[in-house]
């Protein structure tokens, strides 16, 4: 694989023909692509004030923590093995298929998108302790030296930057509502240059409202229900219930919904043992992926009629959460690109491939670096 080689997904998710790739400056020039004002207008045009009321929040919360079936061990093991084998046929290991994938589309430019929690770091009881290993950091650094690389997280952008510690990356915090370009050059100059590295904040007008909702949730949820933790991610809020007694999960959902009745322009979504409070705009990790591709000069939709001159990008998106499904769906709609779900267990997903855990993510990233250097 050359430095602008390609990885390809199965036939139902990829157009196999690959054109000769162009060379791109990295970081990309500020001209071209979609600007910050454009991203704000796009989000405002798609505002949806009636979005995202999931039928039963308690059932949804339980679904984020699947349990083994309470049946005879031998029967349970056989059923689980059969289910896993069937799922792996549809979502094979990205490591096991790597060589075939790497050889399938030489000419496209890889762009790497990575979730943080559960992808680059393990899921832990205390979200403030979700640190990545030095080995993972080295793997991400190696990938970023060869391909445009972005961290796309529900976390506050500054928080995930402090965890990752690599200024040469793009960071899309708050589920893509706070996007900043590489800050290594800007950080050395400070001031105006650092401000210029902010590419997109489509929900800036919601900041006062989110601050008020945060204070209310801390009082009504974190201050009342043992184990609950409310995290301010700047443009969204996370209500963690991983450490809450399951018998109180319903109370968590009820209290959160009670607070949000006073904020009809905020909506509630579900993650892995976390309730997410976001502005009611049509902006998510999938839209962040589109925006970043366009800002890099590629076609956001995957065709030559969109913002890019042609479509020689091959996006690889790796994530473990429900919120990453928005990005996986975008890759499916593009017709090519690799969506990779990080999970030990079968899940409904739009991803084409799978990896079991952050350890396998690290191995996959290292293989990308090795292939690019060959």
Swiss-Prot record:
EC annotation from Swiss-Prot or TrEMBL: 3.1.3.12
Gene3D superfamilies for this protein: HAD superfamily/HAD-like (3.40.50.1000)
Reaction(s) this enzyme catalyzes, per UniProt: alpha,alpha-trehalose 6-phosphate + H2O = alpha,alpha-trehalose + phosphate
Pfam families to which the protein is assigned, alphabetical: Trehalose_PPase
Keyword Nucleus belongs to the record: no
InterPro entries reported for this sequence: HAD-like_sf, HAD-SF_hydro_IIB, HAD_sf, OTSB-like, Trehalose_PPase
Keywords: Hydrolase, Stress response
Cofactor: a divalent metal cation
Pathway(s) it belongs to: Glycan biosynthesis; trehalose biosynthesis
Molecular-function annotations in GO: trehalose-phosphatase activity
Signal peptide residues on this chain, from the entry's feature table: none
GO biological process, one term: trehalose biosynthetic process
Family: Belongs to the trehalose phosphatase family.
Role played: Removes the phosphate from trehalose 6-phosphate to produce free trehalose. Trehalose accumulation in plant may improve abiotic stress tolerance.
Name used for this protein in its record: Probable trehalose-phosphate phosphatase 9
Organism expressing this protein natively: Oryza sativa subsp. japonica
């Amino acid at each position: 694989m050359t430095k602008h080689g390609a990885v390809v997904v199965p036939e139902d998710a990829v157009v196999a023909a690959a054109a000769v790739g162009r060379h791109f400056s990295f970081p990309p020039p500020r001209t071209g692509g979609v600007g910050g004002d454009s991203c704000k207008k796009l989000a405002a045009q798609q505002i949806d004030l009636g979005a995202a009321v999931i039928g039963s929040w308690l059932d949804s919360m339980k679904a984020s923590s699947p349990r083994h079936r309470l049946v005879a061990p031998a029967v349970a093991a056989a059923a689980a093995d059969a289910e896993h084998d069937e799922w792996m046929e549809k979502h094979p290991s990205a490591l096991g298929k790597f060589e075939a994938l790497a050889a399938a589309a030489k000419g496209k430019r890889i762009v790497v998108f990575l979730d943080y929690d559960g992808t680059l770091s393990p899921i832990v009881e205390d979200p403030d302790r979700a640190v990545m290993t030095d080995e993972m950091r080295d793997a991400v650094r190696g990938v970023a030296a060869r391909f445009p690389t972005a961290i796309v997280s529900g976390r506050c952008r500054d928080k995930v930057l402090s965890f990752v510690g690599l200024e040469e990356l793009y960071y899309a915090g708050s589920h893509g509502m706070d996007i900043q370009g590489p800050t290594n050059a800007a950080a050395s100059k400070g001031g105006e240059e650092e401000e210029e590295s902010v590419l997109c904040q489509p929900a800036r007008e919601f900041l006062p409202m989110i601050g008020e909702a945060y204070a209310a949730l801390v009082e009504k949820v974190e201050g009342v229900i043992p184990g609950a933790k409310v995290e301010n991610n700047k443009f969204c809020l996370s209500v963690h219930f991983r450490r809450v007694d399951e018998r109180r999960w319903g109370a968590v959902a009820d209290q959160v919904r009670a607070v949000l009745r006073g904020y009809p322009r905020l909506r509630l979504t579900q993650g892995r043992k976390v309730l997410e409070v976001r502005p009611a705009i049509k902006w998510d990790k999938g839209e962040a992926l589109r925006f970043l591709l366009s800002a890099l000069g590629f076609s956001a939709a995957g065709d030559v009629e969109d913002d890019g001159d042609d479509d020689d990008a091959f996006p690889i998106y790796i994530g473990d959460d429900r919120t990453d499904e928005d990005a996986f769906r975008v890759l499916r709609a593009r017709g090519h690109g690799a969506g990779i779900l990080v999970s030990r267990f079968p899940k409904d997903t739009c991803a084409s491939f799978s990896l079991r855990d952050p350890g396998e993510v690290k191995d996959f990233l290292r293989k990308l670096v090795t292939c690019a250097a060959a």
